[in-house]
A protein has these predicted regions:
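A detector of single, family-specific signature residues
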Residues: 1-199
Length: 199
């Protein structure tokens, strides 16, 4: 009788030992229990009900190694969706934080905030004040390397001017939240890669 994840280990063990395993839907055994004269629920009664249900089924389907693989795939799929939702929430939080400290930056990066170049920049300099004080060569190189050559030195100059004129709040608490949120997003990115590779 299916007991959700509680019986998975037993099913896997029995299949690995080449036993024929059939997992019954609890709805079927529940109906059989209702028809049972003795209403007391004990292990012996449960065993009897399950055995009787098995005997009365014409379409028994036994668990195979393929079924176990599919169970693993479904579990990974559910975990992947959960991880994506976590990452999405973090990205929304990050956008909120950046809007408070450097609202102009979203108009500078046309592809949006969620790209390697922006993450690399904000991890090192999470406020416009810090970006404005960065050495131009370092800023230009940081953007170029993390965008695979997409950003030029001229664009780095434009960004620094934008940072100097920003109306954003210079808030160290939000800056910490920005850097740590990016680290969490990157961790989830790494985890998703491993999950998808396993799938």
């Amino acid at each position: 009788e299916s007991t959700a994840h509680y019986g998975d280990n037993l099913v896997r063990y029995l299949v690995a030992e080449f036993y024929q395993v059939c997992v019954l839907n609890p709805i079927k055994t529940c109906q059989m229990r209702k028809n049972n004269i003795r209403k007391t629920k004990t292990d012996k009664v449960d065993t009897y009900v399950i055995a009787k249900t098995l005997m009365m089924q014409d379409d028994l389907r036994f668990i195979s190694f393929y079924d176990l693989d599919m169970m693993d795939l479904k579990a990974l799929g559910r975990f992947r969706q959960k991880t994506i939702k976590q990452r999405t929430r973090l990205k929304i939080q990050l956008t909120t934080y950046v809007d408070q400290v450097f609202p102009e930056i979203q108009y500078f990066f046309k592809s949006g905030l969620h790209q390697n170049a922006v993450y690399a920049l904000l991890k090192e300099a999470p406020s416009p004040k810090e970006i404005a004080s960065m050495h131009m060569t370092h800023l230009a190189n940081l953007l170029k390397v993390n965008s695979h050559g997409h950003f030029t030195k001229e664009q780095a100059k434009e960004l620094r001017v934008l940072a100097q004129k920003s109306v954003g709040a210079n808030d160290s608490a939000i800056s910490i939240q920005i850097t740590q949120t990016i680290q969490q997003i990157e961790l989830l990115d790494s985890q998703l890669e491993k999950i998808e590779a396993e799938m």
